[in-house]
């Protein structure tokens, strides 16, 4: 099986071999993809979380096994590496990335603390980077980077794969709260951090402040889920 690696800051995964189709998801610098085929200027790929779609051919290069993680957005002369990008020894040498930006791939971080760094970042359908997140892209990226643990890509899959928590009173910081087509991190004290499509950015909202928005969320809440990292 042939593999490739993303060689640009962020690559969109499209439903079809056209940028006019739906953006399914995104993959960022250094992430690997399985090559399924080729169609014109696009490569048919499968990401490591099982998303299949099309990526522009010029955005995929050779795959390298030895990697590190970018812990802050790195601005080079011609390329900005998003938080969570994977780099190898050759990248570090060629790009002259300062060591303060990189960490060993196995080091762990609290996903909630990480997520708070991105409050105010724009909401982007299909987004998985600090250029823009959707709800499940945010939860997946923070858990993947922070705990080196894989959860599914979309909110419905994340919901189904999680361990159910009885109610908000039993929820713990870092649990995921699932709604119809939506997910966010539970922070405690009835607060949730999420990539908020209604506000077009990442926000913290109180679920029990009796506002119209919080009442709407509670009316469509489906499950509180937990992952054992």
What annotation goes with each model-predicted range?
Residues 215-229:
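Low-complexity, Gly/Ser/Thr/Pro-rich intrinsically disordered linker/tail segments
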Residues 1-17, 26-28, 36-39, 46-49, ...:
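SH3-family beta-barrel domains
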Residues 149-210:
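...with weaker cross-activation on analogous glycine-rich loops/strands in unrelated enzymes
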Residues 17-22, 72-77, 159-168:
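Short alpha-helix capping/helix-loop boundary micro-motifs
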Residues 122-130:
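Second-shell loop/turn segments in exported
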Residues 21, 50-53, 61, 95-97, ...:
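Short, surface-exposed beta-strand-loop junctions and turns on beta-sheet-rich folds
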Residues 31, 85, 174-175:
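Structural motif
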Residues 115, 129-146:
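Active-site nucleophilic cysteine motif
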């Amino acid at each position: 099986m042939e593999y490739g690696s993303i060689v640009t800051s962020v690559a969109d995964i499209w439903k079809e071999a056209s940028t006019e189709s739906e953006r399914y998801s995104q993959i960022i610098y250094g992430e690997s993809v399985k090559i399924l085929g080729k169609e014109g200027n696009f490569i048919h790929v499968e990401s490591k979380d099982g998303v299949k779609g099309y990526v522009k051919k010029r955005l995929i290069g050779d795959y390298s096994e030895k990697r590190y993680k970018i812990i802050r957005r790195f601005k080079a002369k011609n390329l900005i590496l998003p938080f969570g990008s994977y780099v190898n020894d050759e990248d570090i040498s060629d790009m002259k990335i300062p060591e303060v930006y990189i960490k060993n791939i196995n080091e762990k971080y609290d996903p909630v603390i990480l997520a708070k760094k991105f409050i105010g970042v724009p909401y982007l359908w299909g987004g998985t980077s600090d250029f823009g997140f959707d709800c499940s892209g945010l939860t997946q990226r923070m858990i993947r980077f922070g705990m080196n643990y894989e959860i599914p890509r979309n909110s419905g899959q994340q919901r189904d794969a999680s361990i159910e928590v009885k109610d908000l009173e039993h929820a713990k910081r870092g649990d995921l709260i699932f709604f119809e087509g939506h997910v966010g991190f539970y922070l405690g004290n009835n607060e949730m951090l999420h990539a908020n499509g209604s506000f077009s950015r990442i926000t913290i909202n109180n679920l029990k402040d009796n506002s119209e928005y919080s009442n709407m969320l509670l009316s469509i809440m489906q499950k509180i889920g937990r992952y054992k990292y």
